[in-house]
Swiss-Prot record:
Keywords for the protein's UniProt record, in alphabetical order: Aminotransferase, Cytoplasm, Glutamine amidotransferase, Repeat, Transferase
GO annotation, biological process: carbohydrate metabolic process; fructose 6-phosphate metabolic process; protein N-linked glycosylation; UDP-N-acetylglucosamine metabolic process
Organism: Lactococcus lactis subsp. lactis (strain IL1403)
EC identifiers of the protein: 2.6.1.16
Assembly mode: Homodimer.
Residue positions of the active site: C2 (nucleophile), K600 (for fru-6p isomerization activity)
HAMAP family assigned: GlmS (MF_00164)
GO molecular function, one term: glutamine-fructose-6-phosphate transaminase (isomerizing) activity
All residue ranges annotated as the Glutamine amidotransferase type-2 domain in the record: 2-219
Protein name: Glutamine--fructose-6-phosphate aminotransferase [isomerizing]
Subcellular localization, as worded in the UniProt entry: Cytoplasm
Gene Ontology CC annotation, any one: cytosol
Upper classification of the organism: Bacteria, Bacillati, Bacillota, Bacilli, Lactobacillales
Pfam family, one: GATase_6
Length: 605
C-alpha cells in the first residue's frame, strides 16, 4: 500500500523516479506524483490521479533535476484526487513530503498547532508537512531539527521522505512500522519502499529500523535516532535479477507467476532437502518447536489460507496442537496462550502490518517465532527469532499465486523435519522430495490444459455476478483461497464454504445458473458426500463445475487433477482455480495484475 522512491545526486532523477514508481505499481495505488529539484534546475511538482502512465503524460521536458521524491498513493485519508495525491507541500512551498502509513493523532496535531493553516486536501500527510514548516519557519529550527520535533509528536505508522527546496540535494527520511530501505550508489543514494524499485540502479542496500532518521546526500548516508545520536549500519547486497521483475512475453504477471510454480516446488526441494532426502532445516527452529506445547500460526489473506494446510501437516507429522489466527483480530484480542507457545508468521511480503502488530506483542513476551516469507530482509524476517524463505522470486501481481503454494511447500519441509526429530513414524515415511516432485508434475499437467480451462470459464462464468466454491477437509481450505482469487480480480462476488454447511443457510442463495465450483480430492467417503452436495445445488438450478483428483474422478467431471499426497493436495488443487480466476478477469477486460482498491503489501492496519 503506497510506495515511496527518492534519489539524490543523479543526473537523471526524473527517469529514476518514474522507473521506480512503475516498479512499485504492484503495491496498489490510485494516484501518483513526483517532486524534482537540483542546483541548476527549477523545482517541479507533478501529480496525477490514475495510472503511472497518466503521470508520465503530464511530465514536460523541463521536469529534470538531480534529486527528487516520488509516491504512489493508496487512499486512506481523503478521496483519490490530485489535491490528496503526494508529494504534499507546506503553505510556502518550501517543504515537500511523501508518506506511507497512518498518522493516528493528526486531528489533535491540527487542532493544537495548525488551526490557522489552510489545507488543499484531506490527508493526514498534509498535517505533517505543515507541522515541519511551522517549526522551521516560525521557530527558526533547521530542517533536521524541525523534522525531529515533528516526529516526536506524531503517533502511528509512517515512512517519510522530506525535501527542503532551499537545500536541493538532501533528502530526510524516517520510519516507524512502515517499510523503507536505503539504496547505495556511486555519487548518488536512494530511498524506496522496497528493493525492486531500485534494482536497476543498485544492488547495495541498507536497512532502516523503526524510529530512526536518515539524512541522504549524494555522497553520504547518516543514520541517527530521534535524539540525534549517529548509529552505525552495515549494508548488504540483494540477490535480485532484472529478469525476475519483467513479464517477458506474458500478457500479465499473474499468468507468468502461475507458470513459475513447478520451478518454485523444485527450487524448494533444492533449498530444504539434501541429496539423500534428509531435511536441511535450521536445527534451532526444530528444537524451538520441539520444546513448544502449542504452535500458533498468524497470517492474513492468502497466507491465512495457506496456514490451514500448514496446520494439517504440522499436527499430523509432529503431534503438536496448532492454532491458526487472523492477524487483524489477534492484534486486538490475543487469546490465552499455552505454557510454551511457538509462533509462525506467514507473509508473502514480510511487511503485513497486522502480522507485525502481533509479532511486536510476541517479542514483548519473549516468545520464540518464525517468519515464513518470500522477501529476505523484510520487517517480519528481521524481527522474528527465525526465518524460512520461500524463494519464489518477486511476485508482482496483486493476486498471490506462487507465494501461496510456496508457503505450503516450505512448511511441509518444516513439519517433516520436526516430526523426524521427534521420531514420528508418519514423518519418516512421508517421502517429501518424491511427493513434491510429483506435485510439480501435476501442476505442469494442469498448466497444459489452459485452453480447456479458458473455455470452461467462457461457458460458465461470462456474465455471472455470484459464484460459490465448496469443499470438505483440505478442499474447504482451497475453496476459501479459490473464492478470494476469483472475487479479487474478476469482481465476481464469490464465497468459499464447507460443503457440509450448505444446508445450514447458504443453499438459499442458489438460483438458476448460479455457478457452484466443487473441489473433490482423493478420499472416497469425502468425495461421495461432496458430490451429494453438488447434486443438491444442481437440483436448485446451479451450474456445477467439478475440480477432482483423478483417484475419485468420473467421466462427467469438469477438470481432473493428477493425484498427489493428501498433505500436498492443496497445492495441486488450487492451480485450476488460479487459472479460472485469471481467465474470468481477462475475459471481462479487467486489469488482472492490478485489481481495483487492492494493494499487494498491506502495510497499514
Amino acid at each position: 500500500m503506497c510506495g515511496i522512491v527518492g534519489v539524490v545526486g543523479s543526473k537523471n532523477a526524473t527517469d529514476i523516479l518514474m522507473q521506480g514508481l512503475e516498479k512499485l505499481e504492484y503495491r496498489g495505488y490510485d494516484s501518483a506524483g513526483i517532486f524534482v529539484n537540483g542546483q541548476e534546475t527549477a523545482a517541479k511538482l507533478v501529480k496525477s490521479v490514475g495510472r503511472i502512465a497518466d503521470l508520465r503524460g503530464k511530465l514536460g521536458i523541463d521536469v529534470s533535476g538531480t534529486a527528487g521524491i516520488g509516491h504512489t498513493r493508496w487512499a486512506t485519508h481523503g478521496k483519490p484526487t490530485e489535491d490528496n495525491a503526494h508529494p504534499h507541500t507546506s503553505t510556502s512551498g518550501r517543504f515537500i513530503l511523501v508518506h506511507n502509513g497512518v498518522i493516528e493523532n493528526f486531528v489533535e496535531l491540527k487542532n493544537e498547532f495548525l488551526m490557522n493553516d489552510t489545507f488543499k486536501g484531506q490527508t493526514d500527510t498534509e498535517i505533517a508537512v505543515h507541522l515541519i514548516a511551522k517549526f522551521a519557519e516560525e521557530e527558526g529550527l533547521s530542517t533536521l531539527e524541525a523534522f525531529k520535533k515533528a516526529l516526536s509528536l506524531i503517533q502511528g505508522s509512517y515512512a517519510f521522505a522530506l525535501m527542503d527546496s532551499e537545500d536541493a540535494e538532501v533528502i530526510y527520511v524516517a520510519k516507524n512500522k512502515s517499510p523503507l530501505l536505503i539504496g547505495l550508489g556511486e555519487g548518488y543514494n536512494m530511498v524506496c519502499s522496497d528493493a525492486m524499485a531500485m534494482i536497476r540502479e543498485t544492488s547495495e542496500f541498507m536497512e532502516i529500523h523503526d524510529k530512526e532518521l536518515v539524512v541522504l546526500t549524494k555522497d553520504n548516508v547518516t543514520v541517527m535516532d530521534y535524539e540525534g545520536n549517529v548509529l552505525s549500519r552495515e549494508s548488504y547486497t540483494a540477490e535480485l535479477d532484472l529478469s525476475d521483475i519483467g513479464k517477458g512475453t506474458y500478457p500479465f504477471y499473474m499468468l507468468k507467476e502461475i507458470d513459475e510454480q513447478p520451478a518454485v516446488m523444485r527450487k524448494l526441494i533444492a533449498t530444504y532437502a539434501n541429496e539423500d532426502g534428509t531435511m536441511k532445516v535450521d536445527q534451532d527452529i526444530i528444537k524451538g518447536i520441539q520444546e513448544a506445547d502449542r504452535i500458533y500460526i498468524i497470517a492474513a489473506g492468502t497466507s491465512y489460507h495457506a496456514g490451514f494446510g500448514a496446520k494439517m501437516m504440522l499436527e499430523s507429522l509432529t503431534n503438536t496442537p496448532v492454532e491458526l489466527g487472523l492477524a487483524s483480530e489477534w492484534g486486538y484480542d490475543m487469546p490465552l496462550l499455552s505454557q510454551k507457545p511457538f509462533f509462525i508468521f506467514l507473509s508473502q511480503s514480510g511487511e503485513t502490518a497486522d502480522s507485525r502488530q502481533v509479532l511486536v506483542k510476541v517479542n514483548e513476551l519473549g516468545l520464540p517465532s518464525l517468519t515464513v516469507t518470500n522477501v529476505p530482509g523484510s520487517t517480519l524476517s528481521r524481527e522474528a527469532t527465525y526465518t524460512m524463505l520461500i524463494g519464489a522470486g518477486p511476485e508482482i501481481a496483486v493476486a498471490s499465486t506462487k507465494a501461496y503454494t510456496g508457503q505450503i511447500a516450505t512448511l511441509a519441509f518444516l513439519a517433516k523435519a520436526v516430526g523426524e526429530a521427534e521420531g514420528e513414524v508418519k514423518a519418516k515415511e512421508f517421502d517429501l522430495v518424491k511427493e513434491l516432485s510429483l506435485v510439480a508434475q501435476s501442476i505442469e499437467a494442469t498448466l497444459s490444459e489452459k485452453d480447456e480451462i479458458a473455455a470452461i470459464v467462457a461457458d460458465l462464468l461470462p456474465t455471472t455476478r455470484n459464484a460459490f466454491y465448496i469443499g470438505r477437509k483440505q478442499d474447504y481450505y482451497v475453496a476459501m483461497e479459490a473464492s478470494l482469487k476469483l472475487k479479487e480480480i474478476s469482481y465476481i462476488q464469490c464465497e468459499g464454504f464447507a460443503a457440509g454447511e450448505l444446508k445450514h443457510g447458504t443453499i438459499s442463495l442458489i438460483e438458476k445458473g448460479t455457478p457452484v465450483l466443487a473441489l473433490i480430492s482423493n478420499n472416497e467417503e469425502v468425495a461421495a458426500h461432496t458430490r451429494g452436495n453438488v447434486m443438491e445445488t444442481v437440483a436448485r438450478g446451479a451450474s456445477a463445475i467439478t475440480i477432482v483428483e483423478e483417484g475419485v474422478a468420473r467421466e462427467d467431471d469438469t477438470i481432473v487433477v493428477n493425484q498427489v499426497h493428501p498433505y500436498l493436495s492443496a497445492i495441486s488443487m488450487v492451480i485450476p482455480t488460479q487459472l479460472i480466476a485469471y481467465y474470468a478477469s481477462m475475459q471481462r477486460g479487467l486489469d488482472v495484475d492490478k485489481p481495483r482498491n487492492l494493494a499487494k503489501a498491506v502495510t497499514v492496519e
